[in-house]
From Swiss-Prot:
Functional note: May be involved in transcriptional regulation.
Gene3D superfamilies on file: Classic Zinc Finger
Superkingdom of origin: Eukaryota
Main location: nucleus
GO cellular component assignments: nucleus
Name of encoding gene: ZNF600
Species this protein is from: Homo sapiens
GO annotation terms (biological process): regulation of transcription by RNA polymerase II
Record-given protein name: Zinc finger protein 600
Similarity remark: Belongs to the krueppel C2H2-type zinc-finger protein family.
Record-linked InterPro entries: Znf_C2H2_sf, Znf_C2H2_type
Paired cysteines (S-S): none
Molecular-function annotations in GO: DNA binding; zinc ion binding
Keywords noted in UniProt: DNA-binding, Metal-binding, Nucleus, Repeat, Transcription, Transcription regulation, Zinc, Zinc-finger
């Protein structure tokens, strides 16, 4: 077993076995202390490094000092005994065995004679900046200290002869071993004033402080990029030199650094040597383990100077800073849309490619994002882990709970920089911004329709496929989107979670509440580009635009009649089915529409809520007041194509058109008599049925025609109903 004599730095002598760490105390070998030799060798090594960097030769005086200082050292110890008394022979006779050999086989300097006749070193010869110490022992076994210095053995400092008993790691010099052992001893004397983190060495603390200050003193001369640590700069420089000499035998991939190759090999072997003591999770890199530990410790050393938010990773801080700077370095090559983070760009690209790599094992549905698949799995499991503390409603996703809590708090943290409008959800803000920019980056190739947000595009795609995977458990009605199903279930449950702060009225849908709030504010944000008319709801604007375009997309399958609005078609269908869902509580008359019933009840109540500001005349319908206004304005918008006669009301024009031949579409089923208007047919059918729906509130007399009732009421002194 090879042994080596080293200094402890405290006047004692350490003897280290190869492969183990054993400590002995010999204090001194005779009157000669090997601590001094090690110190002098260290001084020469340091001076050689300086001279080599400055291009100077190694001064011989330093080398002479190493061998010549032994005379002075002998007199420091009591008794001034010669070395030969303890070692059995003169130390000087064995000094030629001390060599300084240059690294990597370069020509070096060798001490082969005693200091008394040592020749001067040639100027062509240099001492290596990092010399290796070669010590051979010629002392006999009879020496009192032969147990400390093995016979005919050699020690080379480049060998990793110093091993730590705690971790088993080996080093090629004792100073590195001592530094390594400090963490085992728990000696962390350098503390960060910002976050309180402890360090073994002062230089580690200095490097750590740059995380807080953002200092990057090391700059690349090639590209100007700066780094906080010199090791990072060294690694970066290899990108420019592009030297990749380390090759993986498994896959042939090459690396610029051997350390990178070692890390890469762990992918093939699956080796994860770094294990967390808290949760037993294993990692293939120590840096990954260090990052993971912050989850348990809660340490977040990286702080944003703008908003004071803290992060556990530096990369997360760098990404966060882009929120403040507005930087979007990641750009889509297809549609030029820019993104703050690379992950957003990767997600966005799947819109163009249509890639859906994540598949549900339960129903086979595929998703473009893993997070979407994870969320989808909860639908099958019925898991709802997130519960509202106010109303106890449970949600499958935390994001839905956060969104829901804003209903109770009324919080709207997302603000538009253009108009100052605030929103409860970031997605709503993004959709709103497209109103200002006109941007619609999401296009569907099938119908070439464009959308301002990706979720709307995904919803639209289902229209083409006809897929409706979400089914109501109460009525079995199916829906294309889960959100549609959630809204539908509120019809059965009667839940109305959205409440108006002004009048406390509640609504089933958030959009209904938003529309209702405009009643109080009078806001009409939607404007027609044709006539500049404004509307409180987007749907009203869409319907209005059809007046200009003449578009009537809703068609009746029975008679082929077309309508510009879907509710008009729904109401029209009831004419064919005969369905009259709305019934008067006074006279039991039924109506196709609720608005017709509301209009009808005013006959019984004689209510006339709509009053003309010009002449004071009152009306029981808003439409009648609007038509009446045209009398004062002299406006006549409706013209007969046959005789060019104009009318102020559309109904008057329709009635007039029947004067022209062949315009009596309404036929009596009893006597086949035809009429030009539906109202005339209704009056006529009363003759056959004997029905008298119009009743006088004063005397109770009933009439078959409304006009007859109006004339009758004049007898009682009641003003004519218009």
């Amino acid at each position: 077993m090879m042994k080596e004599v080293l200094s402890t730095g405290q006047g004692n002598t350490e003897v280290i076995h190869t492969g183990t760490l054993q400590r002995y105390q010999s204090y001194h070998i005779g009157d000669f202390c090997f601590q001094e030799i090690e110190k002098e060798i260290h001084d020469i090594e340091f001076q050689c490094q300086e001279d080599e960097r400055n291009g100077h030769e190694a001064p011989m005086t330093k080398i002479k000092k190493l061998t010549g200082s032994t005379d002075q050292h002998d007199h420091r110890h009591a008794g001034n005994k010669p070395i030969k008394d303890q070692l059995g022979s003169s130390f000087y006779s064995h000094l030629p065995e001390l060599h300084i050999i240059q690294i990597k086989g370069k020509i070096g300097n060798q001490f082969e004679k005693s200091t008394s006749d040592a020749p001067s070193v040639s100027t062509s010869q240099r001492i290596s900046p990092r010399p290796q110490i070669h010590i051979s022992n010629n002392y006999g076994n009879n020496s009192p200290n032969s147990s400390l210095l093995p016979q005919k053995q050699e020690v080379y400092m480049r060998e990793k002869s110093f091993q730590c008993n705690e971790s088993g790691k080996a080093f090629n010099c004792s100073s590195l071993l001592r530094k390594h052992q400090i963490p085992h001893l728990g000696d962390k004397q350098y503390k960060c004033d910002v976050c309180g983190k402890l360090f073994n060495h002062k230089q580690y603390l200095t490097c750590h402080c740059r995380c807080h200050t953002g200092e990057k003193p090391y700059k690349c001369n090639e590209c100007g990029k700066s780094f906080s640590q010199v090791s990072s700069l060294t690694c970066h420089r290899r990108l420019h030199t592009a030297v990749k000499s380390h090759k993986c035998n498994e896959c042939g991939k090459i690396f610029g650094q051997n350390s990178a190759l070692v890390i890469h090999k762990a992918i093939h072997t699956g080796e994860k040597p770094y294990k967390c003591n808290e949760c037993d999770k294993a990692f293939n890199q120590q840096s990954n383990l260090a990052r993971h530990r912050r989850i348990h410790t809660g340490e977040k050393p990286y702080k944003c100077e703008e908003c004071d938010k803290v992060f556990s990773r530096k990369s997360t801080l760098e990404s966060h800073k882009r929120i403040h700077t507005g930087e979007k370095p990641y750009k889509c090559k297809v549609c030029d849309t820019a993104f703050t983070w690379n992950s957003q760009l990767a997600r966005h690209k799947r819109i163009h490619t249509g890639e859906k790599t994540y598949k549900c094992n339960e129903c086979g549905k595929t998703f473009s994002h893993k997070s979407s698949l994870v969320c989808h799995h909860r639908l099958h499991g019925g898991e709802k882990s997130y519960k509202c503390k106010v109303c106890d409603k449970a949600f499958a996703w935390n994001s839905h709970l956060v969104r829901h809590t804003r209903i109770h708090s009324g919080g709207k943290p997302y603000k538009c920089n253009e108009c100052g409008k605030t929103f409860g959800q970031n997605s709503d803000l993004l959709i709103h911004k497209s109103i200002h920019t006109g941007e619609q980056p999401y296009k569907y190739e099938e119908c070439e329709k464009v959308f301002s947000c990706g979720s709307t595009l995904e919803t639209h795609k289902i229209i083409h496929t006809g897929e409706k995977p979400y089914k109501c458990k109460v009525c079995d009605k199916a829906f294309a989107c889960h959100s549609y199903l959630a809204k539908h279930t509120r019809i059965h449950s009667g839940e109305k979670p959205y409440k108006c702060n002004e009048c406390s009225k509640t609504f089933r849908l958030r959009s209904y509440l938003a529309s209702h709030r405009r009643v109080h504010s009078g806001e009409k944000p939607y404007k027609c580009n044709e006539c500049s008319k404004t509307f409180s709801q987007r749907s009203y604007l869409h319907c209005h635009r059809r007046l200009h375009s003449g578009e009537k997309p809703y068609k009746c399958n029975e008679c082929g009649k077309t309508f510009s609005h879907k509710p008009s078609l729904v109401h029209h269908r009831r004419l064919h089915t005969g369905e009259k869902s709305y019934k008067c509580t006074v006279c039991d008359k039924a109506f196709v529409r609720n608005s017709y019933l509301a209009r009808h009840t005013r006959i019984h109540t004689a209510e006339k809520p709509y009053k003309c500001n010009e002449c004071g005349k009152a009306f029981n319908q808003q439409s009648q007041l609007s038509l009446h206004h045209r009398i004062h304005a002299g406006e006549k918008l409706y013209k007969c194509e046959t005789c060019d006669k104009v009318f102020s009301r559309k109904s008057h024009l329709k009635r007039h058109r029947r004067i022209h031949p062949g315009k009596k579409p309404y036929k009596c089923k009893v006597c086949d008599k035809t009429f030009g208007s539906d109202s005339h047919l209704k009056q006529h059918t009363g003759l056959h049925t004997g029905e008298k729906p119009y009743k006088c509130n004063e005397c109770g007399k009933a009439f078959s025609k409304q006009s007859t009732l109006i004339h009758h009421q004049a007898v009682h002194g009641v003003g004519k109903l218009d």
